[in-house]
Amino acid sequence: MDKHTLVILLHGFTSRPKDLGYVERAIKAVIDRVEVLKPPLLLSRLSIANPGVIVSHLLQLVDKRWETGRYDRIILAGHSAGALLARKLYIAACGNHRFAPLEKELATSCGSARPWAAYVERLVLLAGMNNGWSIDYHMSLGRALQYSVGVIFAQLGYLLTRRWPTILQIRRGAPFLTELRVEWLLMRRDAGIKGVGSALVVQLLGTVDDLVSPRDNMDLVTGSDFFFLDVPDSGHGSVLQMDDSTRGQNRAVVLQNALTWSKETLAIKSAPIEEVNPVLVREDVDEVVFVIHGIRDEGFWTDKIAREIVMEGRAVGRTFARETSTYGYFGMFPFLSPWARRKKVEWLMNKYAEAIARYPQATKFHYVGHSNGTYLLARALRNYRCCHFSRVVFAGSVVPSRYDWDSHLRSVPPRVEDILNYVATADWVVAFFPNCFEYLGIPDIGGAGHRGFTQLDSGGSDSAQPRNIRYVVGQHSAAIRESNWKALANFVVHGYPADGIPSGAATGKDHEFFVGLLALCPPLIWLALLAILASVPALLFLGYSHYHWHEWLVTSLLIAYVSSIGYIGNRI
């Protein structure tokens, strides 16, 4: 007897259920006793809907249909952004995970697995945006311009509404997208224990798709139940055009194969995974350490510290992998932009998700951050529920001194197990600039590299050891000098030493006098700098008005001056 099948078919961004008409026809042509559910989704161009809310509504919809339908199997399918929602729907149906809790819109109703989760046979992703979207060289010029303009308007809209448009919530590195990736990996890892979460996944991707790359499937290819099928002569949108033309029928055949082929047949006839995405998966890695550089820095030193940590771990029989990727040179002016800082946080969390995929047996992640590298983790811990690190080292921190570490240290399970924050004697970079933001009550960045963290002082946390290391002699990079590498490695591998302060660098008793004095009122430094910067335009105006300098000369000098300031601000 034929199985009674329910297919949940989800449209993509700016699309509507009726745009899936050809897809529905192709499904019904090869599956008997099938019901195709095509719900309308809040994915219009101007939508500001939370994707978690969309998935919550889908859960309720499937729950009701399951109660009345008596289905023998379920197939989840989606196009583009709809494929992301199909994956999230499956994750939510399989229940919450303690290390990657679902968002509040889903957590209250997803403590345990849904009864129908075990009946999900496969997911079929049509041009699924498994790694989100980003503007890069793969895009056509027209699409890149369209997305660039859209991002500008979306950011302006956020300033007015304080809500991100839906399209920006599924970009590469965004919280919803990254958390989905981590939730998926943990769900697949625990599928054998929970009895749900192991459905087949088939990705269909057009051969001329300029929005989704075959290499965007890292999270999926690390499992044995993922298969990849090329759709000939198809782009990101035209993959749905399964009309009566030759190309349309070829597309329909690929979809029908994805729906009906057995796992064994898919393994034979799908594209070889190592060619689609040559991911080097290492099952031997026990722990992973991130070593991330900061502003005004290319990060060449990160490999050296990471190597010291790997060697220390090897000496005690533990295998460490290292993540020392660079996000490029990041000058002072870009650092002052919250938009630029947010992009770097998204970069970090993209690397975090990739590391979970690449090292599936790793049980602990550690972090060593300097300058902006400290901000990246602090912000990631606030924005991403799936972010967990065991031991954390901050040097030259640009995080506010009142940052809430207790909530991370005391959460269950802990988001952070232990942390060291090195405070330097003469870190004028932090004392004069990020510290000024904290002095003025502006959140997000601050002077912990100069002040220390309030909650990490003795008595301010559960640890008997001081987590603020006061004071390392030197300036902004004092704690990452070679003399301190061994101490950093010892802490990451072994934890806080019982016999002393974990520092190989020279230590002092207080800040250097002038740094400490000027840091008492850092806005004075800014006012002095602004006065100096304003003096040149003032002199030019004086020359024009009193000494009758030529207008073209004054204009040229002013343009050259502003350009120089911009260049210097991006390099220092």
List each model region and its residues.
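Canonical alpha-helical transmembrane segments of integral membrane proteins
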Residues: P522-L542
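Helical cap/lid subdomain of alpha/beta-hydrolase-fold lipid enzymes
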Residues: Y90-P272, R382-N383, R391-P522
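Membrane-helix interfacial anchor on the cytosolic side
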Residues: S563-I572
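Short, hydrophobic alpha-helix immediately C-terminal to the catalytic nucleophile
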Residues: G21, A86-I91, L377-R382
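Active-site catalytic motif of lipid deacylating hydrolases and related acyltransferases
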Residues: D2-I74, V281-T363
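Gly/Ala-rich beta-loop-alpha elbow adjacent to hydrolase catalytic centers
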Residues: A77-G82, A86, V368-G373, L377
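Hydrophobic alpha-helical transmembrane segments
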Residues: F541-A560
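The conserved beta1-alpha1 loop
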Residues: I8-T14, H79-S80, A127, L205, ...
